[in-house]
Structures are given as structure tokens and as C-alpha cells.
Curated annotation (Swiss-Prot):
Alphabetized UniProt keyword annotations: Cytoplasm, Magnesium, Metal-binding, Nucleotidyltransferase, RNA-binding, Transferase
GO annotation, biological process: mRNA catabolic process; RNA processing
Native source species: Neorickettsia sennetsu (strain ATCC VR-367 / Miyayama) (Ehrlichia sennetsu)
InterPro entries, alphabetized: ExoRNase_PH_dom1 (IPR001247), ExoRNase_PH_dom2 (IPR015847), ExoRNase_PH_dom2_sf (IPR036345), KH_dom (IPR004087), KH_dom_type_1 (IPR004088), KH_dom_type_1_sf (IPR036612), NA-bd_OB-fold (IPR012340), PNPase (IPR012162)
EC assignment: 2.7.7.8
Reaction catalysed by this enzyme: RNA(n+1) + phosphate = RNA(n) + a ribonucleoside 5'-diphosphate
Purpose of the protein: Involved in mRNA degradation. Catalyzes the phosphorolysis of single-stranded polyribonucleotides processively in the 3'- to 5'-direction.
Family: Belongs to the polyribonucleotide nucleotidyltransferase family.
All residue ranges annotated as the S1 motif domain in the record: 632-700
Protein's recorded name: Polyribonucleotide nucleotidyltransferase
A Gene Ontology cellular-component term: cytosol
Length: 757
């Protein structure tokens, strides 16, 4: 029989409950955590030791796979789509998976050979104000401890919301703003950070981190006591170690490695070529002893870390010869791709990002439906990293977790400076193509995106730039590195990405390779990042300091305004007939969102305003600048188009109406194109205005033939010779006058003629 253990406590005003021994009992470890009505089951499985002990083909890193699965039933919903079943992980699930993975990975022994799987399954999400990652991380940490895997936990996740002096923990706010920060921490240090802010200061971030550590404190003893109560926990897993091989590798290549790193080679390619030759020679030297290449490389990399640490901590010199705070050379090219709405090429050292901005309409927004609810995203940022960026060959696959995570981080940074929909009603898509990579490509994406936005003419308030900070520590001494390269990321102890404006931080992400970092070290890293960020911003502002005054000709024209809720149905029409008709006639895209905002997009300004006029007509909106037409009254107009079935006439308020061929004269019109030409002035009466805004006109103004849409109180009067009498045009005097010039009404007439100019 399995023994069921459970325990509860109050944390930040909500009940925290943990249970094990009831479900998933064949796994290495399992824990079910409920926090504030949100329930997550975490299950840990481990590759069998017999298989792991023989595995020497890949020792490049911890073989850990973490998945966060959000089931629709947890939200009380049935999945959308034809099959009504959950498929591949959504973007939201991928991001949650990365959060848990990044928090636990540095606490598992890196030389563990066994493959480890962690599955966090969201079973219930009754309280939508609780971030699911909080119980997921607690459950995963507890399951790892219960499994017996060499894990230096527990690790606790805390969600901090700071707005001025007000601090809230583990409570999702309805409104955006302030500083929102998710922290994974041990009892003494910070392991992982994910944050976005409205230009927060470095000290505000430090204070929020301190609040997170303070909030998590009572949970550590609670989890530790719970794990101790389970008596079946036994150490499992195979830890790779080979002291004999370690010494052989040191003897074979230590001096050569030191020589390469002491050369301070700035070129990544040259440095890697020399290192590659050392790897090859060492493999050849030790292959006769029966060692696999992965085993030899495992100890070579450990030796490289020692050498780099020594150089940085003792001499303050980095592998490429830079000082600790030095930023790599930066070059910028704007309007890089002709024909696009906006583009920029940002290069920093060996890292290069080509960012392209594209503008679209409301129809182009992405509909999201996940654990955060259904919503529409009007700002998209897609990060693409193909093998050629690092000079490698490989299969081209769909965007992976890394690409999704980097894209979301850059999106957080960019959104902080974007205007609201009322100012800029476009859907915006940014695509970052990483064409070269030597570290910090996500921060290059932030810089390139800001430049591309200004090149497009998007009215962003200011530039935003990003920088990646690194850390080298031996447990006693530590050094913070600015603008880390790929080698420094791999051989170092921290990857701390900070994005912001001149006024403050807007996004940050921190990952550790050691078991946490102190608040004091984070403060030093943030202050050093500020200096680097200001340097990068200066370079960007030198190229373009403010957005272009207007969008490019290739960009679509969009108008957004709100209409009354009661007239939405008039604009849409029966079965969408009205709105489709306006769209078809004007070649404009028209949408109305759930908040009654009308979005009109067209290729030209003329088509845009024509569509707006038609929408206003359909809604019955009154505008002092756009006079309203009245059925039964006379207006001066000009023919803008002659077609087989009639004349299209533009009226004084710029709206167009149709004079059907049967409404031109009581006599038969044999050749309409011979008798009427574009630009010819005519007098028309409003016969009817349809619900879709279409205007029916008549030139038979001497007859009492007003349409059913209204009636005329005017007596049946003649207004001079009819324009078509005896086959001749008798309106030569009228045609010679300007479009806005008309003589007074004919004698005895009580019908008014409207002038709007």
C-alpha cells in the first residue's frame, strides 16, 4: 500500500495544500499542489540507471525535459477546434514550461547522466487571479525532492506586483502598469527572474526581489518538513565522474587552452578554429584508451571554465580581450529592405538581427485562447533563429521553445513604448531574423525592433534597448560582464537580460547556471547594465532619434473611431450585407470590435474617407463637418463615372450616389456615354438612402417621384429646361459654372438647394 501524505498552510492570504502518494504512484516522484483554487500535479520520472550508466554518447548537458500542460477541463471548457482535444503545447504552455525548467535546472547536479522528465499538469484553475506557475513550481520542486534525484531544493516561485509603495504578492492585477515580477528563489538566493515594467528604476527591481524572498520564507520550512515526513525517499540517479580521465585531459591540453585564451582573440571564428584543433588532437590522443569523444569534451569544457574564470577574476580580461564593462562595436542600417513598411539591421559584435515591421488591420490580430482567457493580440513579435546564424547545418523546423521565449521577452520590452490603439490603430507584426549570433540575440532583437518601429513611422515615445549581462564567480569572488558573447554565456554562471529606456527598465530575464545569486550581486549587475544600456541608446539615437513623421507609401491607411452601441447593427446590416457592401464598393477592410470601435483600412486616403462616410451614413452619425443629406431635396453634383446602367454623381459632401439610367429622363436614353461625360455638372434629387448608406438619385426633378424612403413636401415645379430635351444638352450655362455655383431657385419654386462649401 502507498502511504498518502498531505499538509496545508496559509500563504499570502490563500490556502496552500500539498499531497503525495495518491496519484502517479509509479513515477519517481509526484506531488499535487493546490493554491488558492488552482491545482497542479507535478510528476518526475527518471531514466533507468542500467541504461544511463552505459550512456556516454552525449554529456553536453543535463538531459532535462519539462512540460507544463493546461487542460481545458481545468477552466471548465471544451477545447476549440474540430477534434475537441488538446494538441501540441500552446505558446502559453511553452512559456510556463520554460519558467519551471529554468528554475529547477541549476539545482540539479549537472553531471547527472539519467534523462529526467518533469510534467506539470494544470488540473483546476478556479482562481484566475493566481498565476499557475506558482503551484507548478512548488509541485515540481517537491516532486524532485521526493524522487531522490540529486536536487538542491526546494525552490519557490513568487509573483510580485509593485505599484509605487504598494506591493502585492501572488495576486494577478486586472490592469497593467507598475512592475510585475516572477521570482524563483531558494532560502538564500535568487535562481530565476522574469519581469516587465513601466520604466522601473534599478532600486525598485531590487526592492521587489527582496519582497519576493521575504514572501517565500515560510514556505521553505513547510516543504522541507513535508518531504521529511515521507520515509520512502531514496537517492537515485547516476552521476558521471572519471578522475583519471580528468587528469589525462588536463595533462593533454591544459597548456594549449591557456595559450589560446591568453591570446585574447576577438574573432569568434579564429578562436573556435584554434580550439577545435585542440579538441581534435586531444580526442586522437585519448581515443586509444577507449574514451568516447563526449567524455573527453566534458572535461575539456570544465577545464575551459577554470581558465576563463581565472583570467576574468584575477586579471579582469575576457576571452575576446574586452574589459568587464566594454560593449562590442555597434552598426545600424535603416530602411534596409525596400518595399517593406519598416526595417532595420542591428549588428553588435558577432550578433546581428534583421527586424522587419509590417502594419495590418484589426482583421490581422491574433486571437488567443489559453489559460489567460480569450483575447486579441494586436502586437506580434516573432523571433527566428536558423542554423546558419552560427555557421551550422541542420533541419529547418517550426519555432522551438527558445525562439518562442526570446520573442516573448523582446515583445515585453517593445510593448512598453508603443502607443495605444486610439493613437495608432494598426495591428503590428515585428519579425526578427537572427542572421548572425554570438550571444545576446534576444537583446539585439529589442534594439532592432525599436529602430524598425521608428523607421516605419510608428509614434513610439522613445527608443528601447537591451543588453545581456553575465557573471563569473568562484564562490568568493565575482565579476559582472557587460554584453556577453556566446562563449561567455556557455562558460559563465549567469545570463541576465535587461531591456529599458533612458528612464527605466521595461523587461528583464535572469537565468543561473549556479545555485542562485545574492540581491547585492543583482544590484551591481543592474547598475552596470544601466551604463551599457545608455551607451547603446546613444548609438541608436545618433542614427534616428524620433519616428518618421509619416508612414511609408507602402503602408496601409487605417482609421479607428468609436460608434454608439445602438447603431452597430445598422452598420453591419442584415447578415452583414451593409458592411460587406461598403467594403466591396470602396475596396476597404472594415471591422467592428466588441468595444464598438470601427476599424477601416484602405490603400489610399480617398478610399479610406469614402468608406468612413458610408459607415457614418449607415449609422446615422451626425458630424458638423460632414453635412447630412435629406431625402427629397435638390443638390448640385458632378458626374464621376458613366456606366451602362447609369451615372455615379459625387455630392457636395463628397458622398457618391447613383442615378439609374431610368432616372435620367422620362424619355429613353439610347447612348448614355455620348450624352454624359465625367466632370459634367448636374442637378439631382435624393430619391432614397438605403440602410447600407447607398444613395439613390434622380434627375427627373420636374416630377413628384420621391422614393419610399421619404416624401417631399415641395410642390411639383419646373426648374428650367430638362437636361435631355430633343436629344440636346440645354444646360450649357450650368456646366460652365463652378461645382459650387448655382443660381437661385426657379421662379415659384419652394424647393431649397443645399450648399455645403
Amino acid at each position: 500500500m502507498f502511504e498518502i501524505k498531505e499538509s496545508s498552510m496559509e500563504w499570502e492570504g490563500k490556502s496552500l495544500h500539498i499531497k503525495t502518494g495518491e496519484v502517479a504512484r509509479q513515477a519517481a516522484g509526484a506531488a499535487c499542489v493546490s493554491y488558492g483554487g488552482t491545482v497542479v500535479l507535478a510528476v518526475v520520472t527518471l531514466q533507468k540507471d542500467t541504461a544511463a550508466s552505459k550512456k556516454t554518447s552525449d554529456l553536453s548537458g543535463l538531459a532535462l525535459v519539462t512540460n507544463f500542460l493546461a487542460k481545458s477541463y481545468a477552466l471548465g471548457r471544451i477545447p476549440n477546434g474540430f477534434f475537441k482535444r488538446e494538441g501540441k503545447l500552446s505558446e502559453r504552455e511553452v512559456l510556463a514550461s520554460r519558467v519551471v525548467d529554468r528554475a529547477v535546472r541549476p539545482l540539479i547536479e549537472e553531471n547527472l547522466v539519467n534523462e529526467v522528465n518533469i510534467v506539470c499538469k494544470l488540473l483546476a484553475h478556479g482562481n484566475r487571479k493566481v498565476l499557475p506557475e506558482i503551484p507548478a513550481l512548488i509541485a515540481a520542486s517537491a516532486a524532485l525532492q521526493l524522487s531522490g534525484i540529486p536536487f538542491s531544493g526546494p525552490v519557490i516561485g513568487v509573483d510580485v506586483d509593485m505599484r509605487g509603495s504598494e506591493v502585492t504578492c501572488n495576486e494577478i492585477r486586472e490592469t497593467e502598469g507598475g512592475l510585475e515580477l516572477f521570482v524563483a528563489c531558494t532560502e538564500e538566493s535568487v535562481v530565476m527572474v522574469e519581469a516587465e515594467a513601466s520604466e522601473a528604476s534599478e532600486e525598485e527591481v531590487v526592492n521587489a526581489l527582496s519582497e519576493a524572498l521575504k514572501s517565500a520564507k515560510p514556505v521553505f520550512s513547510f516543504i522541507n518538513e513535508f518531504v521529511k515526513s515521507v520515509t520512502t525517499v531514496k537517492p537515485i540517479g547516476v552521476l558521471y565522474d572519471n578522475k583519471e580521465l580528468c587528469e589525462k585531459v588536463r595533462a593533454a591540453c591544459s597548456g594549449q587552452l591557456e595559450s589560446v585564451y591568453n591570446e585574447r582573440i576577438s574573432s569568434k571564428e579564429k578562436r573556435h578554429n584554434k580550439l577545435g584543433q585542440i579538441y581534435t588532437d586531444t580526442f586522437a590522443q585519448l581515443s586509444d584508451d577507449g574514451y568516447a569523444e563526449s567524455e573527453v569534451l566534458f572535461f575539456i569544457k570544465k577545464l575551459e571554465k577554470e581558465i576563463v574564470r581565472k583570467n576574468v577574476l584575477e586579471e579582469g580580461i575576457r576571452p575576446d580581450g574586452r574589459s568587464l564593462t566594454e560593449i562590442r562595436p555597434i552598426s545600424i542600417a535603416l530602411d534596409y529592405l525596400p518595399g517593406t513598411h519598416g526595417s532595420a539591421l542591428f549588428t553588435r559584435g558577432g550578433t546581428q538581427s534583421l527586424v522587419v515591421a509590417t502594419l495590418g488591420s484589426y482583421q490581422d490580430e491574433q486571437v488567443m485562447d489559453d489559460i489567460d482567457g480569450e483575447r486579441r493580440e494586436s502586437v506580434l513579435l516573432h523571433y527566428n533563429f536558423l542554423p546558419y546564424a552560427v555557421g551550422e547545418v541542420g533541419a529547418l523546423r517550426a519555432p522551438g521553445r527558445r525562439e518562442i521565449g526570446h520573442g516573448r521577452l523582446a515583445l515585453k520590452a517593445v510593448k512598453a513604448v508603443l502607443p495605444g490603439k486610439e493613437v495608432f490603430p494598426y495591428t503590428l507584426r515585428l519579425v526578427s531574423e537572427i542572421t548572425e549570433s554570438d550571444g545576446s540575440s534576444s537583446m539585439a532583437t529589442v534594439c532592432g525592433s525599436s529602430l524598425a518601429l521608428m523607421d516605419t513611422g510608428v509614434p513610439i515615445t522613445k527608443h528601447v534597448a537591451g543588453i545581456a549581462m553575465g557573471l563569473i564567480t568562484d564562490g568568493v569572488r565575482s565579476a559582472v560582464l557587460s554584453d556577453i558573447s556566446g562563449d561567455e554565456d556557455m562558460l559563465g554562471d549567469m545570463d541576465f537580460k535587461v531591456a529599458g529606456t533612458r528612464n527605466g527598465i521595461v523587461a528583464l530575464q535572469m537565468d543561473m547556471k549556479v545555485r542562485g545569486i545574492s540581491i547585492a550581486t543583482i544590484r551591481d549587475a543592474l547598475n552596470q547594465a544601466l551604463a551599457g544600456r545608455l551607451h547603446i541608446l546613444e548609438k541608436m539615437e545618433h542614427v534616428i532619434a524620433k519616428p518618421r513623421e509619416s508612414l511609408k507609401d507602402s503602408a496601409p491607411k487605417i482609421l479607428c473611431y468609436k460608434i454608439d452601441k445602438d447603431v452597430v447593427h445598422k452598420v453591419i446590416g442584415s447578415g452583414g450585407k451593409t458592411i460587406r457592401g461598403i467594403s466591396s464598393d470602396t475596396s476597404a477592410k472594415i471591422d467592428i470590435d466588441q468595444n464598438n470601435y470601427v476599424y477601416i483600412m484602405a490603400d489610399t486616403e480617398e478610399a479610406l474617407m469614402e468608406a468612413k462616410t458610408r459607415v457614418d451614413m449607415a449609422s446615422g452619425a451626425s458630424d458638423s463637418n460632414v453635412p447630412q443629406l435629406k431625402i427629397g431635396e435638390l443638390y448640385d453634383g458632378k458626374i464621376v463615372s458613366v456606366v451602362d446602367f447609369g451615372l455615379f454623381v459625387v455630392l457636395p459632401n463628397k458622398q457618391e450616389g447613383l442615378v439609374h439610367i431610368s432616372e435620367i429622363s422620362k424619355n429613353r436614353v439610347n447612348d448614355i456615354r455620348a450624352d454624359y461625360t465625367e466632370g459634367q455638372a448636374v442637378t439631382v434629387r435624393i430619391k432614397d438612402i438605403g440602410s447600407d448608406g447607398k444613395i439613390k438619385l434622380t434627375m427627373r426633378i420636374d416630377e413628384d417621384r420621391v422614393g419610399s424612403g421619404g416624401s417631399s413636401s415641395s410642390p411639383k415645379k419646373r426648374f428650367g429646361a430638362h437636361p435631355r430635351k430633343n436629344g440636346k444638352d440645354n444646360r450649357s450655362n450650368n456646366s460652365e459654372r463652378g461645382f459650387n455655383e448655382r443660381s437661385g431657385s426657379a421662379e415659384g419654386s419652394s424647393i431649397s438647394r443645399k450648399r455645403f462649401f
